[in-house]
Amino acid sequence: MDILERTFKKLTRLKDNLQDLSQEEAYEVFRAILEGKLSDIKTTAFLTAMRIKGETSEELLGVIKAIKERMNFPQKKEDALDLGLNYDGKNRTIYILPSALWLCSRLGVEFTNHYALGAPTKEGVTLYEVVKELGVDMNVSFVDQKNYAPELYKLMPLRRELGFRSLINTVEKFLNPFQTKKIVVSIFHKPYFDKNAELLELLGIEDYTIIKGLEGGIEPLPDRPTLVKKRGKDIESIEPKSLGLEMPKDVHSENVLRDSLEINRKIIDGRERGEFFNWALYTAGVLLYAAGECESVEEGVGRVEKEST
């Protein structure tokens, strides 16, 4: 029995008897998927079984190794902060991240982001789309998944057809094609803090920050506490009221791209200095903290605010 047969046998049991895979087994299965050696039916079975079982950090690491072996790496940007955002974007709330990036860029902070358009399950608006339409330099480098990981990108139609968040939604945030030393990643649920921290340690990332933000992203929630975990520290609860800044009460949107462009253009042009500008300051403070440019979010907000006056 070869490793693929043995691995699938582990994943074709009843739910209570599903067995975790070794890092090597996860690597071999996903390598076979990327090489087109597994049918869509077997690929679907693998992704579904892993979804039901729940992935371990070792399994995710094996999948990442299989992907990275076949990646096309752009120019290395070791000192930048990689924005490991959920690839499926946003479909319910306004982006404030572009204004925050613009504010941080004035302090010389560099960012990277990798993305794919139309990624499941939300198939929402990506940061890239908003920044591209704004046409303003924010010191951020982008790379499309279809260019840096074409074999992975070929799975997109199957992922859309499946219609659920698979392990690919998790691992693609950690691929770090620009090979930065610093990463900030987003999560949807609090239990993922520990698993993501363990995975980042296994990947050897020198400095990482994990954020449970708006729509599972890295933007801090304007109306309630945001949970943040920095490497080597406990989970922090950042309360917007503690910053002494009035935040917007409602950031929902029926047209994310249109409304995001409108708000961010006003901030960048200097026409908005109210609640949304304050939210941009808050988000920029979080980014500076994640980039290791300050010791706390509060300090980061103060630095950005001083630069903006």
Swiss-Prot record:
Identify one Pfam family in the record. Answer: Glycos_transf_3
Gene Ontology CC annotations of this record: cytosol
Q: Does the keyword Methyltransferase apply?
A: no
UniProt keyword annotations, A-Z: Glycosyltransferase, Transferase
Top-level taxon of origin = Bacteria
Q: Where are the transmembrane segments?
A: none
This entry's Gene Ontology molecular function terms read: anthranilate phosphoribosyltransferase activity
Q: Fetch the Gene3D superfamilies from UniProt.
A: Nucleoside phosphorylase/phosphoribosyltransferase catalytic domain (3.40.1030.10), Transferase, Pyrimidine Nucleoside Phosphorylase, Chain C (1.20.970.10)
Q: Which InterPro entries match?
A: Anthranilate_Pribosyl_Tfrase, Glycosyl_Trfase_fam3, Glycosyl_Trfase_fam3_N_dom, Glycosyl_Trfase_fam3_N_dom_sf, Nuc_phospho_transferase
UniProt record, GO biological process: L-tryptophan biosynthetic process
Family that this chain belongs to: Belongs to the anthranilate phosphoribosyltransferase family.
- Name used for this protein in its record: Uncharacterized protein aq_209
Species this protein is from: Aquifex aeolicus (strain VF5)
At the highest ranks, the source species' classification is:
Bacteria, Pseudomonadati, Aquificota, Aquificia, Aquificales
